[in-house]
Amino acid sequence: MKLLYTDIRTSLTEILTREAEELVAAGKRVFYIAPNSLSFEKERAVLEYLSQQASFSITVTRFAQMARYLVLNDLPAKTTLDDIGLGLAFYKCLAELDPKDLRVYGAIKQDPQLIQQLIELYHEMTKSQMSFLDLENLTDEDKRADLLLIFEKVTAYLNQGQLAQESQLSHLIEAIENDKVSSDFNQIALVIDGFTRFSAEEERVVDLLHGKGVEIVIGAYASKKAYTSPFSEGNLYQASVKFLHHLASKYQTPAQDCSQTHEKMDSFDKASRLLESSYDFSELALDVDEKDRENLQIWSCLTQKEELELVARSIRQKLHENSDLSYKHFRILLGDVASYQLSLKTIFDQYQIPFYLGRSEAMAHHPLTQFVESILALKRYRFRQEDLINLLRTDLYTDLSQSDIDAFEQYIRYLGINGLPAFQQTFTKSHHGKFNLERLNVLRLRILAPLETLFASRKQKAEKLLQKWSVFLKEGAVTKQLQDLTTTLEAVEQERQAEVWKAFCHVLEQFATVFAGSQVSLEDFLALLHSGMSLSQYRTIPATVDTVLVQSYDLIAPLTADFVYAIGLTQDNLPKISQNTSLLTDEERQNLNQATEEGVQLLIASSENLKKNRYTMLSLVNSARKQLFLSAPSLFNESESKESAYLQELIHFGFRRREKRMNHKGLSKEDMGSYHSLLSSLVAYHQQGEMSDTEQDLTFVKVLSRVIGKKLDQQGLENPAIPTSPSSKTLAKDTLQALYPAKQEFYLSTSGLTEFYRNEYSYFLRYVLGLQEELRLHPDARSHGNFLHRIFERALQLPNEDSFDQRLEQAIQETSQEREFEAIYQESLEAQFTKEVLLDVARTTGHILRHNPAIETIKEEANFGGKDQAFIQLDNGRSVFVRGKVDRIDRLKANGAIGVVDYKSSLTQFQFPHFFNGLNSQLPTYLAALKREGEQNFFGAMYLEMAEPVQSLMAVKSLAGAVVEASKSMKYQGLFLEKESSYLGEFYNKNKANQLTDEEFQLLLDYNAYLYKKAAEKILAGRFAINPYTENGRSIAPYVQQHQAITGFEANYHLGQARFLEKLDLADGKRLVGEKLKQAWLEKIREELNR
């Protein structure tokens, strides 16, 4: 046994490589052991330091893989499982346990998170050389019983099936202990690099090999000052020093100091010594000069995105200045990998910097996992429509085109069907021939056939089930689709998809191993497959050696690269505080360690935090050979953050914090580097003139199109492919002639008028192009309205001999039996429930009709307008016709005055501001149409809300009070003529603001005609502006801006071309209500008409 240590600015790998070469010269075969996270880097470094750059006698490997290189006499007869297989075994054993048998974990026994934690605990106990029976020492009785039962069942199952989950080190330990290793130990040597602690399993291997006479060399970083100090607690080198002291004591071998004498102390050595003296409370006088501050820079940035851009620019600049540099000379360290992963790809692709993030990716969100999840959901939830749509959307099932999938989805949404029997029936329903039923039935059979065959599978042996699954993948064209999808991808992405497919096949292999000979149902198989895929991870290797490596900062080793950029070093990320998320608490781990024999140790993360983090900081400061950049953003994940205390210490020593910002207001040589990045800088620079005070979050193409469009506009040029703002063209004359022939009547409805004043282009889409909403066969708001209208129409037409309640019930019964409504509301339990709710609404609304003796209903669903009577006359002599339907016409019994009623599903009131702006013309239009048909005597026009009133019981003192308050909301809302208001009862909301004189009534009708005239002239001229209205001058309401994907209108960029609603000109702070508000708007109407 030989123990070495060196100062952190001397390459430990170089020293240990020399030791390895000496051992080779002595005839030894050397295993150069490195930690898992550093093995690839160590291999490259060792090859560089070897005098011949190669050696057949030196193998750079990891502890776990060393067993492969030693010849074992008896290979284990058992089949080895990996984590996926072990997870499946846990899933199977837990599924067989009754929830009542588990006191703590019964309710979550098949939860993926619990299974993951059980796997981790299984591995931890194996590495710590601890037996599962040691769990008997747990003090929590319920947890002890559960864990012992679970591990006992899993262990019995693995032994029964000749399955092994032991690590390779366990096999090696067993082989060495039983003399089953045929390799000559005298010809073997170990060189161990990069460790500051061994697991119990690793230490056991070292102990056994040392006992067999194997020469072992172990090296670590430590200063002589730290190693010889009698007190190491809190020291930066505490982790490595304690490690060396433990080994020196155990093997009675003092550690040798191999530190080299450096001619000049570099900046990083200086920072290391200052940090060390700070933590061991010794005094050290060292001056930090400008060169040191240049070599070790501390950046303060605003955002993570800015950090990455600054790093990318810096790399590009250095490559531009020094042609000898390449990407492999740079290393990027991340404070939090997940937070930077997406932005990293976007920005580095923009700057054309190849990078490799050595991180495993989870398969949980891959389309292949979603494919399995959709099939499981189809089986488990009996063929829901949404699950079938999700399956088709993965683009992995069947070779149907996107247009076929869209047509099929549209049709099954129209039908609203669920359940396999419904899908097995031939499609026969169509909406006026809109759907191609013949084609849809061909698609239905193509989609259902493989699924029907698969779902017909009963519980059977795993081997047979896998055969059926293989047939399903072939018939469903899954493998073909995956292959076709990957052929169009880049080479790197093709490799990624290949790794995904390997992981998928591996899950199936592990399933076959674990369940060999077992009876498995299809649903259990799909659940296990989905569970295995959710636990699976895959990773790719870099396509080239010359790439910028990106990794988490806590995996760094000293002297890794020439230039190192460590970003995201906030207080939350540096230091990283390891949290215990396992099934055993720190206290339970401590108790188990004390109760078991020496050498059997579970790791307690919290006890390792301090010494591990200080050593990590030391490695971080010394990670660069030439220049190191440490950065912390002020905003991390959109919340304020502080820089790490370690960075503040460096600043205290004399290193300077540099405020770094991206400056788009000027261009400099730093913007040079790559074509894409330069173009991006130019775009950002030109953006400043129009949007300097707003934070942009647009794609590169959008920004570029806006800037180029602006430049073209300045030159008097136009490119319709890149407009500066959304605009529409006036329709051509021949188009207008085809749409609105001079000899043909032009009709404009009140709903069309409202749509026009909401957004002119929306009118064009709906009423000119005929854009329709998605069809639904199931009952919707329209069918609910028709149902209620029909009930009231029938109830009011029945003879008055019976009471109103009897007539209403008769109307409900007869309407419910109509074929149209019977088909809709008897289709499903959900539809029947909806019908009951609607009937409650009908009975509640009937309360107003039942107790209203002052009026009588003379017409229901009355049509108005038509060819006989023009609504308005345009200046060019062309007539505009309005036609529509009034829900109900009432007449006052006292004097025969007419009133118009419109049913609404929610509370609707007449509002003068909306009427003035063309958004509330329904009631005036009804009155004007009836007046043109000869009616002269009116009492008003109103809305009736058809809904059950909701009253908060907290706002009233008694139930009787609730009834009174609820009845207040059940009133007719609208416009009433002042002279007739005395005849109207309590069911009419006839306050002063809603009452009109004859002159005011006529004024409203005149202005309403004016609104129709303005709209008709624009429509007939073919001018449809993209101008959704804004009520507050800051945003557009969602129901106004329904066609954003078509128009491209974005409120935060194009608000200037929105229509700002006209408002009253009031003095600051003045507010009008009631009668005064009405009079102010009427005066504004007079002014508008007199212009």
From Swiss-Prot:
InterPro entries in the cross-refs: ADDB_N, DNA_helicase_suRexB, P-loop_NTPase, PDDEXK_AddAB-type, Restrct_endonuc-II-like
EC code(s) of this entry: 3.1.-.-
Any one of the GO BP annotations: double-strand break repair via homologous recombination
Pfam families linked to this entry: ADDB_N, PDDEXK_1
An example molecular function term from Gene Ontology annotations: 5'-3' exonuclease activity
Disruption phenotype: Cells lacking this gene grow poorly, are more sensitive to UV light than wild-type cells and have reduced double-strand exonuclease activity.
Domain of life: Bacteria
Keywords of this entry: ATP-binding, DNA damage, DNA repair, DNA-binding, Exonuclease, Helicase, Hydrolase, Nuclease, Nucleotide-binding
SUPFAM superfamilies membership: P-loop containing nucleoside triphosphate hydrolases (SSF52540), Restriction endonuclease-like (SSF52980)
Cofactor(s) listed in the protein's UniProt record: Mg(2+)
Entries under HAMAP family matching the protein: AddB_type2 (MF_01453)
Family membership: Belongs to the helicase family. AddB/RexB type 2 subfamily.
Extra remark: Despite having helicase-like domains, this subunit does not have helicase activity.
Task of the protein: Involved in DNA double-strand break repair. Is not involved in recombination during natural competence or in plasmid establishment.
Subunit and partners: Heterodimer of RexA (AddA) and RexB.
Protein name per its UniProtKB record: Exonuclease/helicase subunit RexB
Organism: Streptococcus pneumoniae serotype 4 (strain ATCC BAA-334 / TIGR4)
Gene name tied to this protein: rexB
